[in-house]
A protein has these predicted regions:
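Substrate-binding groove of N-acetylhexosamine-processing glycoside hydrolases
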Residues: 1-156
Length: 156
């Protein structure tokens, strides 16, 4: 009753199924797309080269659904929500941290509070572009997925 499972191994859906069957509380944080230390796009060159597995773009974070994991969800399952993880052993500066988080953290937030039937990536893109002025105002070094060459990747 007090156990919370953080499910991150999307390649092992049978483990999620066991947790669902045992009625554990579950937070979904699958590596693909919820590991924010993975590259955001193919232009990234520094740090761990996760591109051989996947780029975890803001679009993938935004569009992630529990239904992407092939399990049988009980009618009243205990999915508490979703979470993204950012492992920082290779992040040495605040700019690098910001770059890896933003705008994917905005995509995560909107994914978490928006019902599946109301998600619309085009509408989100309009709102996201407006966030960039706020990021600049707060000196957040973000990755601009619309013009990625204009927001160069920090080396570390």
């Amino acid at each position: 009753e007090h156990t919370i499972v953080f499910f991150w191994r999307q390649n092992r859906p049978e483990q999620l199924q066991k947790s669902l069957d045992r009625k554990f509380n579950i937070v979904l944080c699958p590596r693909l797309p919820m590991y924010l230390d993975y590259a955001q796009d193919t232009l990234q060159v520094h740090g761990v080269d996760w591109r051989k597995f996947s780029c975890n773009s803001y679009q993938k974070v935004y569009s992630f659904s529990p239904q992407d994991i092939p399990v049988k969800y009980p009618k009243n399952c205990n999915i508490l929500g979703i979470q993204a993880n950012l492992w920082t052993e290779r992040i040495e500066t605040e700019d690098r941290l910001d770059y890896m988080l933003f705008p994917r953290i905005a995509a995560l937030a909107e994914n978490a509070w928006t019902k599946e039937m109301n998600k619309n990536i085009n509408s989100f893109n309009i709102r996201l572009k407006k966030q960039f002025d706020l990021y600049k105002k707060d000196h957040i070094y973000y990755s601009d997925p619309f013009t990625p060459k204009e927001t160069g990747e920090p080396v570390r």
